[in-house]
Amino acid sequence: SYLLANKEVDGKTAIRYFTDDGKIKDNVVLADMKLAADIPTDVVLFNIDSKGEMTGKQSKDAIVSVFLKVFNEMQGFCGSMPFLADLERKLSEEGLYDTFQSRFEEASSSPWKEARNEFDFNQDDVVKVLSDMEFMSVEAARNWCEKATEPYAISIERFAQLVKTYIEKKGKNHHVVFLVDEIGQYIGDDSKLML
Protein backbone atom coordinates (compact mmCIF):
# COMPACT_ATOMS: atom_id res chain seq x y z
CA SER A 1 0.00 0.00 0.00
CA TYR A 2 2.86 2.40 0.76
CA LEU A 3 4.41 1.75 -2.64
CA LEU A 4 1.15 2.13 -4.59
CA ALA A 5 0.39 5.41 -2.83
CA ASN A 6 4.11 6.28 -2.82
CA LYS A 7 3.67 7.54 0.73
CA GLU A 8 6.39 9.52 2.38
CA VAL A 9 7.87 8.15 5.61
CA ASP A 10 10.61 10.02 7.47
CA GLY A 11 11.07 12.39 4.53
CA LYS A 12 11.54 9.60 2.00
CA THR A 13 9.02 8.28 -0.53
CA ALA A 14 8.25 4.57 -0.53
CA ILE A 15 9.89 3.95 -3.90
CA ARG A 16 13.14 5.51 -2.66
CA TYR A 17 13.40 2.85 0.07
CA PHE A 18 13.85 0.38 -2.77
CA THR A 19 15.90 2.46 -5.21
CA ASP A 20 18.35 4.25 -2.91
CA ASP A 21 19.94 1.08 -1.54
CA GLY A 22 19.83 -0.90 -4.77
CA LYS A 23 17.60 -3.51 -3.11
CA ILE A 24 15.95 -4.42 -6.40
CA LYS A 25 18.38 -5.83 -8.95
CA ASP A 26 15.89 -6.71 -11.69
CA ASN A 27 15.45 -3.62 -13.90
CA VAL A 28 12.05 -4.76 -15.19
CA VAL A 29 10.70 -5.17 -11.64
CA LEU A 30 12.20 -1.82 -10.67
CA ALA A 31 10.63 -0.11 -13.71
CA ASP A 32 7.23 -1.62 -12.81
CA MET A 33 7.59 -0.41 -9.22
CA LYS A 34 8.48 3.11 -10.38
CA LEU A 35 5.54 3.13 -12.77
CA ALA A 36 3.18 2.07 -9.98
CA ALA A 37 4.60 4.71 -7.64
CA ASP A 38 4.22 7.45 -10.27
CA ILE A 39 0.50 6.84 -10.85
CA PRO A 40 -1.67 8.99 -8.54
CA THR A 41 -3.42 6.44 -6.35
CA ASP A 42 -5.67 6.37 -3.31
CA VAL A 43 -5.04 3.14 -1.45
CA VAL A 44 -7.77 1.86 0.86
CA LEU A 45 -6.18 -0.77 3.10
CA PHE A 46 -8.47 -2.44 5.61
CA ASN A 47 -9.35 -5.60 7.50
CA ILE A 48 -12.85 -6.48 6.33
CA ASP A 49 -13.80 -8.29 9.52
CA SER A 50 -13.01 -5.28 11.70
CA LYS A 51 -14.78 -2.83 9.36
CA GLY A 52 -17.88 -4.98 8.82
CA GLU A 53 -21.00 -4.71 10.93
CA MET A 54 -21.57 -7.49 13.45
CA THR A 55 -25.02 -8.26 12.05
CA GLY A 56 -24.18 -7.33 8.48
CA LYS A 57 -22.80 -10.66 7.29
CA GLN A 58 -26.30 -12.08 6.91
CA SER A 59 -26.94 -9.74 3.99
CA LYS A 60 -25.91 -10.70 0.49
CA ASP A 61 -24.72 -7.10 0.07
CA ALA A 62 -22.49 -7.22 3.17
CA ILE A 63 -19.23 -6.95 1.25
CA VAL A 64 -20.27 -3.99 -0.89
CA SER A 65 -21.53 -2.26 2.28
CA VAL A 66 -18.10 -2.60 3.87
CA PHE A 67 -16.42 -1.31 0.70
CA LEU A 68 -18.79 1.68 0.69
CA LYS A 69 -17.98 2.36 4.34
CA VAL A 70 -14.21 2.45 3.81
CA PHE A 71 -14.56 4.38 0.54
CA ASN A 72 -16.62 7.03 2.34
CA GLU A 73 -14.11 7.18 5.21
CA MET A 74 -11.22 7.56 2.77
CA GLN A 75 -12.90 10.71 1.42
CA GLY A 76 -13.53 12.09 4.91
CA PHE A 77 -17.24 11.32 4.80
CA CYS A 78 -19.24 9.43 7.41
CA GLY A 79 -18.47 5.71 7.19
CA SER A 80 -21.04 4.42 9.63
CA MET A 81 -24.08 6.17 8.13
CA PRO A 82 -24.16 6.05 4.32
CA PHE A 83 -27.08 8.49 4.05
CA LEU A 84 -24.95 11.10 5.82
CA ALA A 85 -22.03 10.32 3.50
CA ASP A 86 -24.36 10.87 0.54
CA LEU A 87 -25.32 14.28 1.93
CA GLU A 88 -21.68 15.15 2.58
CA ARG A 89 -20.74 14.03 -0.94
CA LYS A 90 -23.51 16.16 -2.50
CA LEU A 91 -22.54 19.19 -0.42
CA SER A 92 -18.91 18.66 -1.40
CA GLU A 93 -19.80 18.40 -5.10
CA GLU A 94 -21.62 21.71 -4.85
CA GLY A 95 -18.76 23.36 -2.95
CA LEU A 96 -20.91 23.74 0.18
CA TYR A 97 -19.49 21.12 2.55
CA ASP A 98 -17.16 23.50 4.41
CA THR A 99 -19.96 26.05 4.73
CA PHE A 100 -22.28 23.36 6.07
CA GLN A 101 -19.71 22.26 8.65
CA SER A 102 -19.09 25.84 9.82
CA ARG A 103 -22.77 26.66 10.09
CA PHE A 104 -23.52 23.38 11.84
CA GLU A 105 -20.88 24.14 14.45
CA GLU A 106 -22.34 27.62 14.94
CA ALA A 107 -25.84 26.17 15.39
CA SER A 108 -24.93 23.24 17.62
CA SER A 109 -21.63 24.27 19.28
CA SER A 110 -20.18 20.94 18.11
CA PRO A 111 -17.94 20.17 15.14
CA TRP A 112 -19.89 18.29 12.45
CA LYS A 113 -17.49 15.36 12.22
CA GLU A 114 -17.87 14.72 15.95
CA ALA A 115 -21.62 15.34 16.11
CA ARG A 116 -22.63 13.37 13.01
CA ASN A 117 -22.28 10.07 14.86
CA GLU A 118 -25.12 11.24 17.08
CA PHE A 119 -27.26 12.22 14.12
CA ASP A 120 -30.52 11.17 15.80
CA PHE A 121 -29.96 13.88 18.41
CA ASN A 122 -28.82 16.56 15.95
CA GLN A 123 -31.53 16.42 13.29
CA ASP A 124 -33.04 19.78 14.20
CA ASP A 125 -29.68 21.49 13.73
CA VAL A 126 -29.13 19.67 10.42
CA VAL A 127 -32.56 20.75 9.16
CA LYS A 128 -31.97 24.35 10.24
CA VAL A 129 -28.55 24.57 8.60
CA LEU A 130 -29.63 22.91 5.34
CA SER A 131 -32.65 25.19 5.05
CA ASP A 132 -30.74 28.35 6.09
CA MET A 133 -28.18 27.56 3.38
CA GLU A 134 -31.10 27.16 0.94
CA PHE A 135 -29.73 23.74 0.07
CA MET A 136 -33.12 22.19 0.93
CA SER A 137 -36.44 23.46 2.15
CA VAL A 138 -37.33 22.73 5.77
CA GLU A 139 -39.79 20.07 4.60
CA ALA A 140 -37.28 18.41 2.29
CA ALA A 141 -34.59 18.46 4.99
CA ARG A 142 -36.98 16.89 7.53
CA ASN A 143 -38.00 14.25 5.00
CA TRP A 144 -34.34 13.53 4.25
CA CYS A 145 -33.57 13.21 7.99
CA GLU A 146 -36.36 10.66 8.39
CA LYS A 147 -35.04 8.58 5.49
CA ALA A 148 -31.46 8.87 6.75
CA THR A 149 -32.19 6.55 9.65
CA GLU A 150 -33.77 3.84 7.49
CA PRO A 151 -31.81 0.80 6.27
CA TYR A 152 -29.47 1.69 3.41
CA ALA A 153 -29.06 -0.52 0.36
CA ILE A 154 -26.57 -0.10 -2.45
CA SER A 155 -25.96 -2.31 -5.44
CA ILE A 156 -22.52 -3.28 -6.65
CA GLU A 157 -23.24 -1.30 -9.82
CA ARG A 158 -24.12 1.86 -7.88
CA PHE A 159 -20.98 1.51 -5.76
CA ALA A 160 -18.85 1.05 -8.88
CA GLN A 161 -20.42 4.21 -10.32
CA LEU A 162 -19.53 6.17 -7.16
CA VAL A 163 -15.91 5.04 -7.42
CA LYS A 164 -15.82 5.79 -11.16
CA THR A 165 -17.20 9.30 -10.61
CA TYR A 166 -14.64 9.91 -7.87
CA ILE A 167 -11.78 8.75 -10.13
CA GLU A 168 -12.98 10.88 -13.06
CA LYS A 169 -13.08 13.98 -10.85
CA LYS A 170 -9.50 13.32 -9.74
CA GLY A 171 -8.37 13.08 -13.39
CA LYS A 172 -4.81 12.40 -14.59
CA ASN A 173 -5.11 8.59 -14.70
CA HIS A 174 -5.98 8.49 -10.99
CA HIS A 175 -6.51 5.06 -9.44
CA VAL A 176 -8.28 3.74 -6.36
CA VAL A 177 -6.99 0.44 -5.01
CA PHE A 178 -8.79 -1.56 -2.33
CA LEU A 179 -6.48 -3.89 -0.40
CA VAL A 180 -8.60 -6.19 1.74
CA ASP A 181 -7.22 -8.32 4.55
CA GLU A 182 -9.01 -11.41 5.91
CA ILE A 183 -11.50 -11.64 3.02
CA GLY A 184 -11.31 -15.45 2.89
CA GLN A 185 -12.17 -15.78 6.56
CA TYR A 186 -14.95 -13.20 6.22
CA ILE A 187 -16.63 -15.08 3.39
CA GLY A 188 -15.91 -18.55 4.73
CA ASP A 189 -18.41 -21.03 3.34
CA ASP A 190 -21.21 -18.46 3.03
CA SER A 191 -22.27 -18.61 -0.61
CA LYS A 192 -24.32 -15.39 -0.19
CA LEU A 193 -21.09 -13.45 0.31
CA MET A 194 -19.34 -14.87 -2.73
CA LEU A 195 -19.44 -12.69 -5.84
Where do the PLM segments sit?
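Active-site-adjacent bridging/hinge elements
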Residues: 34-43, 134-140, 167-177
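Charge-rich, solvent-exposed alpha-helical interaction surfaces
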Residues: 66, 86, 103, 125, ...
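Long, low-complexity, polar/charged, intrinsically disordered or flexibly structured peripheral segments
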Residues: 108-159
